[in-house]
């Protein structure tokens, strides 16, 4: 049930924001139709990283990933970055033709940088365009009434994608009148 109108939503959790020194610890993906109805969800994948990689996390990552249980899931995982990339790519291919969907999410440019470096096959499969929900959030702050979508910010990849989709629906109704 591939469709060029379907959208690819991805969220990553990482050991930090520096693409040159940090690694991906979790990936999740959701496919929606163009009206933002969820078609399918890929289970989030914790990606194994050795202790020396985890030891280099900043304070925010240590606190957050410990509280969510991600750090332990990463330590216990048997899944490599390459295996996680392959699983997510197989999921995406079921629903979206090659280079037909923009990569969607919040501050998605940051995720895209990590995909380009560590999961280049996913990066290449997505269209070069990106649908960044953060743009609408900022436009609402600058030109709207300032009332923004309230997020739970669980920093769990699948939860974050679901929130991004809900946030885009919120801003679509509020700002776009379409």
Swiss-Prot record:
Signal peptide range: none
EC number: 3.1.15.-
Entry keyword Nuclease: yes
InterPro entries, A to Z: Exonuclease_RNaseT/DNA_pol3 (IPR013520), Oligoribonuclease (IPR022894), RNaseH-like_sf (IPR012337), RNaseH_sf (IPR036397)
Family as reported in the entry's similarity comment: Belongs to the oligoribonuclease family.
NCBIfam families for the chain: PRK05359.1
Designated name of the protein: Oligoribonuclease
Organism of this sequence: Francisella tularensis subsp. tularensis (strain SCHU S4 / Schu 4)
Gene that produces this protein: orn
């Amino acid at each position: 049930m591939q469709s060029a109108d379907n959208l690819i939503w991805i969220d990553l959790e990482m050991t930090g924001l520096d693409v040159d020194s940090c690694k991906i610890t979790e990936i999740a993906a959701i496919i929606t139709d163009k009206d933002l109805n969820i078609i399918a969800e890929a289970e989030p994948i914790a990606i194994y990283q050795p202790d020396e990689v985890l030891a280099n996390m900043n304070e925010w990552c240590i606190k957050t990933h410990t509280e969510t249980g991600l750090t332990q899931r990463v330590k216990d995982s048997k899944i490599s970055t390459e295996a996680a990339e392959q699983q997510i790519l197989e999921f995406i291919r079921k629903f979206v033709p090659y280079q037909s969907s923009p990569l969607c999410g919040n501050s998605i440019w940051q995720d895209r940088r990590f995909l380009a470096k560590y999961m280049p096959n996913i990066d290449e499969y997505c269209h070069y365009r990106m649908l960044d929900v953060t743009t609408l959030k900022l436009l609402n702050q600058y030109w709207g009434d300032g009332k923004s979508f309230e997020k739970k910010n669980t920093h769990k990849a699948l939860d974050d994608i679901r929130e991004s989709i809900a946030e885009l629906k919120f801003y679509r109704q509020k700002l776009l009148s379409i």
